[in-house]
Amino acid sequence: MTSDPTSSTAFVFAGGGSLGAIEVGMLRELVASGERPDCVVGASAGAINAAYFAGRPDEDGVAMLAALWCRIRRQDIMPFSMRSLVAMLLRNRPHLVEADALRLLLERNLPYRRIEQAALPLHIVATDVLNGREVVLSAGPVVDAVQASAAIPGVFPSVSIGGVELVDGGVANNTPISVAFALGVKRIVVLPAGFACALRVPPRSAIAHATHALTLVIARQLVRDLELYGARAQIHVVPPLCPLDVSSYDYSQCAQLIDKAAERTRAWIDAGGLAQCEIPGQLREHDHAAVLSH
């Protein structure tokens, strides 16, 4: 970070499963507009984006991150099978699948080994599985930290770091504005994944149901956090996509999500969005019978 944290900027990347692709479109336009953060903070899927961007914080790095998201398929991250379900039940295993596929993806694509080696100061949020306490990882092996932050409880195994068992950072703090604020940063740009506000039918699988419900809870919590910290810091929230009918469990539409988010973010920037500190209407409870004003 810069020597004067009160004049520095943090990018905060939220969790959101496959909707993390939306943040990449937002990031593309923020960087193209000249935004350069002094540090990055991320949780869950947002930890993947934060870690990758921290290693290559420029337009080429964003393009490479977008290409990565476009290659990802659900089986690359969550390789579910009947065999894995049977193994969980018969062996009394506390998780559905091993995290080998996710770990391999991270090892192949992150261009550095330790958090301290990133080009930007990087802070990854995870959750202590025993007490729900937020744990901020600002040093140590980056793959372990990101894997811990993305370890959905019950789906992936916890990750042991420093003798503490850690799971998904979204459990404790999915959009870690408070972490950026605690670092002394006074200008925060939030990249929220949003939620599928226009689904026509409920998600079909148990995990899709759970992840969708979590995104709804997260959006409500983000609004409360913005109300809490809005008077204490300069916070700019990039509006998420709305209406959105893509589940956070659906990885087949990442390219479209990136491009659409980039288009909407460019329009928001051109309209003076980075000069405003407002809570986007897309994050609040709404239906699509009414036209959102933001």
What residues fall within each predicted segment?
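Patatin-like phospholipase
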Residues: 1-43, 48-294
